[in-house]
Amino acid sequence: MTEAMKITLSTQPADARWGDKATYSINNDGITLHLNGKDDLGLIQRAARKIDGLGIKQVALTGEGWDTERCWAFWAGYKGPKGVRTVMWPDLDDAQRQELDNRLTIIDWVRDTINAPAEELGPEQLAQRAVDLLCSVACDSVTYRITKGEDLREQNYMGLHTVGRGSERPPVLLALDYNPTGDKDAPVYACLVGKGITFDSGGYSIKQSAFMDSMKSDMGGAATVTGALAFAITRGLNKRVKLFLCCADNLISGNAFKLGDIIRYRNGKNVEVMNTDAEGRLVLADGLIDASAQHPQLIIDMATLTGAAKTALGNDYHALFSFDDTLAGRLLTSAAQENEPFWRLPLAEFHRNQLPSNFAELNNTGSAAYPAGASTAAGFLSHFVENYREGWLHIDCSATYRKAPVEQWAAGATGLGVRTIANLLTA
């Protein structure tokens, strides 16, 4: 059996022969990471990516200085979508080791689920995986209902049914109730709503291959909020939280929805479809209507919703939108505490009015006259949140997935956002 490569930490610079910018050096005892006190977690993550790139698949984190955050930074960079990697973790106290183990279980579940091929992960499989994860951490406190196919139409979940009807795999709504109180009448503290588009071709507004090749990841919002709830439970969440996952394929067929169709929602809103590739907001609307009906203190929806958010922030930050400044500040505080990247983008009352339609109350996409696509998408969603000015956060999760490797991440899912939402839920 191959001996594990030892990885140690040092606050001293590397030997001059390695250059003045060296972040790691190799010696007879293994590899030393040279911390400079400026961005130590980022340095560790980038070094781990390089170590993986060397083909080293077994490592042992040894010596002084390792804690949960540094171990996790190493794993975030070391983990990749192909092959098996083995890490021997340093000695940590019980609380730190439990926190690390929970991250390894839950956030790796999120990354692996998002990376799964669409052929293996359809709407029903995504919903069932979410149930299985949450039952693994709190089954006694979990109840759920799965509604699919024509039952969605009969129950007037018209956005989800319309988007998903073009696929042979029926659309699915997962409504899950985490209620640790044991009281069926306990108030709902928070609702989490996730976009679960298990493959997005764009529909008749079809994507080019260069934009479609990563669309197995269009369910990243659903996976992330599921992981966030599970992770919050491991951190002691004792409040009632409901989860709504809106799962569907967006495909082309003789039964697929078309431009010019009008969707009539249960809250009385009528929406004209002028871009079938703006489908995420159409399915989220159904989940947000259900979430609002619970009258929670907090609603968080999460979705890989717009290319505009990626244009603004790249894949480096999740985009945050809210009318509630206090709540937005709380989430950004949680993000800072968890070392996760979020950035607030504008959402104003006028964005709600930048989706005009000649035939319905709303258009599902903005026109050239209103180019702020991420903000108008958030404005669209606000029409389905009963009290949209208070207690609602929309996250356009542009940092969920990377099509190609970069210096700190392998290609694929990142798992970013799980810890921040869990932190907010348990604050």
Curated annotation (Swiss-Prot):
CC cofactor: Mn(2+)
Keyword annotations: Aminopeptidase, Cytoplasm, Hydrolase, Manganese, Metal-binding, Protease
One GO term (biological process): proteolysis
Protein name: Peptidase B
Recorded GO MF terms: manganese ion binding; metalloaminopeptidase activity; peptidase activity
Alphabetized SUPFAM superfamilies for the sequence: Zn-dependent exopeptidases
Listed EC numbers: 3.4.11.23
Chain positions recorded as Mn(2+) 1 binding sites: 200, 277, 279
Family named by the database record: Belongs to the peptidase M17 family.
Task of the protein: Probably plays an important role in intracellular peptide degradation.
Co-factor remark: Binds 2 manganese ions per subunit.
Positions of disulphide bridges: none
Record organism: Salmonella typhimurium (strain LT2 / SGSC1412 / ATCC 700720)
